């Protein structure tokens, strides 16, 4: 027998029969073995045929297996085809020629198994198979196609295998309702009604609802709310994954796609093919000698034989379609723009019920409004309605987890009970009866409280679950009513709408009343998603604090100046300006189109300009390293400017992004410090103009980075020598005049060096004054606290006398260099000598070390 003219599936079926013979210890390959092989290898073929003929495939398989088991067992021989099996395969070859096929397929073998007289033909006839019905089923399966390749069976029912029927999905309630988008759906219907080139392509940003428009079309077709020429049409969504998966041989992918196209063509306009991410077809399957998948579609698309809807993003359309003009002209563009906030709110209101039934919680209307407003303000790299839906979904999931978990009060009581029980066991051993009685009494009280709490929690949970079950039932009944209305069963519609639904609504109302009565003023379970839950999710996503402030945080913000003064000594004007900006932001009064605040700090070196930025970062994020610091001395050359936003295409480092833009994309809520701006190239200021004005910056990949939640601080030593010389003139009487005059002159210097359009965008320009001796002494105290803390970690206690502090203040005071000499003085006079004394054991580290001054230096004693 020559198996070269058999399809791959037919060869596999015969091989399966051989394997079965060997595994059962038999020798002759009987028709029963071949039928077993056909049913195992060609499930899609036999299942379709058995279904069409009303046969029970599982029952047939059991009878065949019993027949195989009854065949004689022979050991040691080579498997061979029995006379009947040989006749079956010969007959199958004959049938393939009769039908005009090039290869013997599984249907030919099945037809031969029925017509060649054997026990198997009897089994098939008894199960209800006749030759005429089998031939009809084969024709229906093939849809008029001939077997022209060895993988032909893979292409039967190709739409069922490689596409998803959206009409069926809508009919069974698997698709979410589509709210709005009427204009876009109308445009799609208009294009689909054309004679040729009737292929709309939906183009829009990710998450704007392109796929939802096609789902909306499927819903409309189901309701009959479409023009006459589109009524009863089927919408199939092409599954690219299934199309490519398992295509091992060259040309197999193209063959599958061709069979899908042919099936759509044969429907004569009854099938509309939806290709999501259509750009994946351009270049798919292309290789040595193979044709691009898009080229297979082109002829059918141009002639109007294939009605298809594509969906892709703007970027992908430009990248793939605009290069291929022949493909581009076959599609008509439907622009899908991001909906505005009002449209998005109505979309979320329409979806609310679906999410409530899924999560078994209620979603308040203010949560929907908050989801839209907060997502459009703070999540700028994604699009509505997708990001707002995600917020609502996650907030509901979070609340559901809390509902299913034990309430916090109950958990605390349970932990306390466990702790007391452990204590009681320990005291039992000591035989301390009075203590045992006290603990026993406390335990009994706590257990009573726990019992009542548990009962209340369980009761609330039971009532909530009952409400949600009723809501799910309502949704199912509404779906049933819609189905009955489509089928014209108006009696059932009336029974559901005016009977069952009203009864369930009443039941929900009664249960809610009961729940409210049980909860009173204090509910144990929170059952509603509110705006605060949404704000909490936004904070987790972005790190931006948008949730309501606790009282402790309000107090902290009101006394922010004191917090900052713990690290920065003096400079009241600067601290007040920064604190006001932070308070405006947290109170929701900042301009939403600009950064929280932008400042230029001027002054001599070492007066606290950079330290204030660090102190602010520590206050906001509990970690000063959360500050994004850009040292402008690194940007002195013109070409180095590109490092801020990323190298242009074609240059090394293009994929890495910019130092500034990447830092803010990852941490949108941060303090950005541009240190020593006078050292930067003038072109850097051009880049910063749009950051200060619009709170946005476009990086090298065209992504817009949002700076609206950043505090921008720039420091400069400009005019420091002038400030220094002026401060020497200070005396008690003329202090205010000299400071004002100095500020005026420094501002003039700033205007000469930095362009007016840049300075005009800065919120406040603040001059830091040189530090006085009193302030230097405070800085010494601050730094000594740090030293004491460090020594305490090593078990050494350090005490400073006033004389020692005064000495360090004197040697550390240098008006020209600010506070930096203090650190050097502490290192030189205190730490260096102390380390020597500790190593030589001149001082006892187990006792407190007292540091005093003799006027020339520091002395150490215990």
Curated annotation (Swiss-Prot):
Residues 771-862 are annotated as: C-terminal. Its main location: cytoplasm. ATP 2 binds at residues 603-610. Residues 389-520 form a coiled coil. Belongs to the ClpA/ClpB family. This is Chaperone protein ClpB. Part of a stress-induced multi-chaperone system, it is involved in the recovery of the cell from heat-induced damage, in cooperation with DnaK, DnaJ and GrpE. Acts before DnaK, in the processing of protein aggregates. Protein binding stimulates the ATPase activity; ATP hydrolysis unfolds the denatured protein aggregates, which probably helps expose new hydrophobic binding sites on the surface of ClpB-bound aggregates, contributing to the solubilization and refolding of denatured protein aggregates by DnaK. Residues 157-338 are annotated as: NBD1. One of its GO terms (biological process) is cellular response to heat. Residues 339-543 are annotated as: Linker. The keyword Protease does not apply. It comes from Bacteroides thetaiotaomicron (strain ATCC 29148 / DSM 2079 / JCM 5827 / CCUG 10774 / NCTC 10582 / VPI-5482 / E50). GO terms for cellular component: cytoplasm. Homohexamer. The oligomerization is ATP-dependent. ATP 1 binds at residues 204-211. GO terms for molecular function: ATP binding; ATP hydrolysis activity. Residues 81-144 are annotated as: Repeat 2. It is found in: Cytoplasm. Residues 3-144 form the Clp R domain. Residues 6-71 are annotated as: Repeat 1. Residues 553-770 are annotated as: NBD2. It comes from the Bacteria. NCBIfam families: chaperone_ClpB. The gene is clpB. Keywords: ATP-binding, Chaperone, Coiled coil, Cytoplasm, Nucleotide-binding, Repeat, Stress response.
């Amino acid at each position: 027998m020559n198996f070269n003219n058999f399809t791959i599936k037919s060869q596999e079926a015969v091989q399966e029969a051989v394997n079965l013979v060997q595994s059962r210890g038999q020798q002759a390959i009987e028709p029963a073995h071949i039928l077993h092989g056909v049913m195992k290898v060609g499930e899609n073929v036999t299942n379709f045929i058995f279904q069409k003929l009303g046969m029970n495939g599982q029952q047939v398989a059991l009878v065949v297996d019993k027949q195989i088991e009854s065949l004689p067992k022979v050991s040691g021989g080579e498997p061979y085809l029995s006379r009947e099996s040989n006749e079956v395969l010969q007959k199958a070859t004959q049938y393939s020629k009769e039908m005009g096929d090039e290869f013997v397929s599984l249907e030919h073998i099945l037809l031969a198994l029925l017509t060649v007289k054997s026990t198997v033909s009897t089994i098939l006839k008894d199960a209800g198979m006749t030759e005429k019905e089998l031939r009809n089923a084969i024709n229906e399966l093939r849809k008029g196609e001939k077997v022209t390749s060895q993988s032909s069976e893979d292409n039967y029912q190709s739409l069922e295998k490689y596409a998803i029927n959206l009409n069926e999905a809508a009919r069974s309630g698997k698709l979410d309702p589509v709210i709005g988008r009427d204009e876009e759906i109308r445009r799609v219907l208009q294009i689909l009604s054309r004679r040729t080139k009737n292929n709309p392509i939906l183009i829009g940003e990710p998450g704007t609802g392109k796929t939802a428009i096609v789902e909306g079309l499927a819903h409309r077709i189901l309701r009959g709310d479409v023009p006459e020429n589109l009524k009863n049409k089927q919408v199939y969504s092409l599954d690219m994954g299934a199309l490519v998966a398992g295509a091992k041989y060259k040309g197999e992918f193209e063959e599958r796609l061709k069979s899908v196209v042919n099936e759509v063509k044969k429907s004569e306009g009854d099938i509309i093919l939806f290709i999501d991410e259509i750009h994946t077809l351009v270049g798919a399957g292309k290789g040595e000698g193979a044709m691009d998948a898009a080229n297979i579609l082109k002829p059918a698309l141009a002639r109007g034989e294939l009605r298809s809807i594509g969906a892709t993003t703007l970027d992908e359309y430009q990248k793939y379609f605009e290069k291929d003009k022949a493909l581009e002209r076959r599609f008509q563009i439907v622009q899908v723009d991001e909906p505005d906030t009002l449209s998005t709110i109505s979309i979320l209101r329409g979806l609310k019920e679906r999410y409530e039934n899924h999560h078994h919680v209620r979603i308040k209307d203010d949560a929907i409004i908050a989801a839209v407003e907060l997502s459009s303000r703070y999540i700028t790299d994604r699009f509505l309605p997708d990001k707002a839906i995600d917020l609502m979904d996650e907030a509901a999931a979070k609340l559901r987890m809390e509902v299913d978990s034990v309430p916090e009060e109950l958990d605390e009581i349970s932990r306390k009970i466990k702790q007391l029980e452990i204590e009681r066991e320990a005291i039992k051993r000591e035989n301390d009866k009075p203590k045992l009685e006290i603990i026993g009494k406390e335990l009994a009280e706590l257990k009573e409280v726990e019992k009542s709490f548990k009962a209340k929690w369980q009761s609330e949970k039971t009532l909530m679950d009952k409400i949600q079950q009723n809501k799910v039932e309502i949704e199912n009944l509404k779906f049933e009513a819609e189905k009955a209305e489509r089928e014209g069963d108006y009696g059932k519609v009336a029974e559901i709408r005016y009977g069952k639904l009203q009864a369930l609504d009443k039941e929900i109302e009664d249960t809610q009343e009961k729940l409210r009565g049980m909860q009173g003023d204090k509910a144990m379970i929170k059952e509603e998603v509110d705006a605060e839950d949404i704000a909490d999710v936004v904070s987790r996503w972005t790190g931006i604090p948008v949730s309501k402030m606790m009282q402790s945080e309000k107090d902290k913000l009101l006394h922010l100046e004191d917090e900052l003064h713990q690290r920065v000594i003096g400079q009241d004007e600067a601290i007040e300006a920064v604190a006001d900006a932070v308070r405006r932001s947290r109170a929701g009064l900042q301009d939403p189109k600009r950064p929280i605040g932008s400042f230029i700090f001027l002054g001599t070196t070492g007066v606290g300009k950079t330290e204030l930025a660090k102190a602010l970062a520590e206050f906001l994020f509990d970690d000063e390293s959360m500050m994004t610091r850009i040292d402008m001395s690194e940007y002195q050359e013109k070409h180095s400017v590109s490092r801020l936003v990323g190298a242009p295409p074609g240059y090394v480092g293009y994929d890495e992004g910019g130092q500034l833009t990447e830092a803010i994309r990852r941490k949108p809520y941060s303090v950005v410090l541009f240190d020593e701006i006078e050292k930067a190239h003038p072109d850097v200021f051009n880049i910063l103009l749009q950051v200060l004005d619009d709170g946005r910056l476009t990086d090298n990949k065209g992504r817009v980075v949002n700076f609206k939640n950043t505090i921008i601080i720039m420091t400069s030593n400009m005019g420091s020598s002038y400030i220094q010389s002026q401060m020497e003139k200070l005396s008690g009487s003329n202090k205010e005049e000299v400071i004002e005059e100095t500020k005026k002159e420094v501002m003039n210097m700033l205007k000469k060096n930095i362009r007016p359009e840049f300075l005009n965008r800065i919120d406040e320009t603040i001059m830091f004054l040189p530090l006085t001796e009193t302030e230097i002494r405070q800085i010494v105290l601050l730094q000594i606290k740090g030293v004491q803390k460090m020594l305490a970690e090593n078990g050494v206690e350090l005490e400073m006398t006033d004389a020692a502090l005064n000495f360090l203040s004197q040697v550390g005071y240098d008006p020209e260099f600010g506070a930096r000499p203090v650190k050097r003085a502490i290192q030189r006079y205190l730490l260096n000598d102390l380390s020597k004394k500790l190593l030589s054991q001149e001082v006892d580290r187990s006792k407190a070390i007292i540091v005093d001054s003799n006027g020339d230096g520091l002395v150490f004693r215990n």
